[in-house]
Amino acid sequence: MYIYLKTPLQNHSKYLPHLVEHCSGHSALDAVNFFEFSYGLDGVSTPEYTRFEYDKRVPYEKALEKLFTPLQKSAFLYETKILQEELGDPSYDQRIYEAVIRQYINPAISLNGIEKPSREEVEKYHAMRYRPENVIVTSEKFQVFYHGFKPQNTFDQVQLQIISDTFDFEDDAYFLLLYKNHSAKEYWELYFIFWMLCFCSTFVMRRQEGNYYFLEPYFHRFGEVCWCLFPRLDYQILTPQFFEHGKQYIFKMIAEGYFKEMFFLNEYFYGIPLTRIQVLDFYKNYTYTTFLAKLKAFL
C-alpha cells in the first residue's frame, strides 16, 4: 500500500518537507509499532510529493492516523541528526538531478542542502500538508483506495522550448535534450527517446565494448520541464532496424502494463493525463524520421 502527499518545496528547498517525512515515520522506532509500521519508517521525498509504503495488511485508515498525529519533540531532535547524515553524502543520481535543475531551471533550488528550521516550522508544515485533503492512498497496483484531491490540471499550453546541449557533470560527459512548457504528447515523446537511448547505450557499452560499468541515460522532470541526459557516445548503431526493434519492445512494455506508478503520478501530480491506450497509439505512429529530427544536434 502506498500513501502519497503533496509536499512542495519550501522557499525553493526540499529540506523542510524531507525532515517532516523523517519525523512522520519516527513512531515506527518504538517496539510497539515497529513490526506493523516498519515499512513506514522511511518514506520517499521528492520536490513535489512524499510517498510512504505500508504492508497491505495495515488498514490505510490506521496508517493515515499515524501520519497525521502531531509530531513529537523527540522525533524532531532525533531525525534532524539522521537527515543531516543522509544529506552529507547524497548519491550520484541525486547530485546530477539537482545540477540540471539549478543550471537550466532555477539556481536557487536546493534539494540536498542542509538547513536549520525550527521545531515550530516543522510542526507548521506537517499540520498544513499531512491532512486528509492532501492525500491519495493506492494499492501496490495503483488502484486508488482514497483520494483527498482530484487529478492535477494540465499545464496551460505555451510554446514548447527545446534545449539541446552538452552537459559535463563531475568527470562524466553527457548530451542533454530538455523540453520546457511541454504537452502530454511531447512528454511521452521524450520518454520514448530516453528508452531508445537506453537500449543503444547498453548495446554499445556493454555488448560491443565489454564494459561492466558504464554511464546510462536519465529521464527526469521538474514542474513544466522534462529532460533526458544520455552519455556522449557514437550513436551510429541507431539504424532503422535498431529503431523498429526498440520501438516494438517499448510498445510491448506499455501494452503489458509496465510503468503503473508513472501513469498514476502523471495523472494526479504532473498534469500529463494521457491514458495507456493514447500513449500506445502515439508510439505506434512515431517514426524513425521524427526520432532522428529530435536528435539531429547529437548524431
Describe each model-derived feature in a short phrase.
Residues 1-16, 142-203:
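His/Glu-based metal-binding/catalytic segments typifying zinc-dependent metallopeptidases
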Residues 16-24:
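Active-site His/Glu-centered metal-binding helix of metallohydrolases
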Residues 23-158, 205-299:
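Charge-rich, well-structured scaffold segments of protease-associated domains
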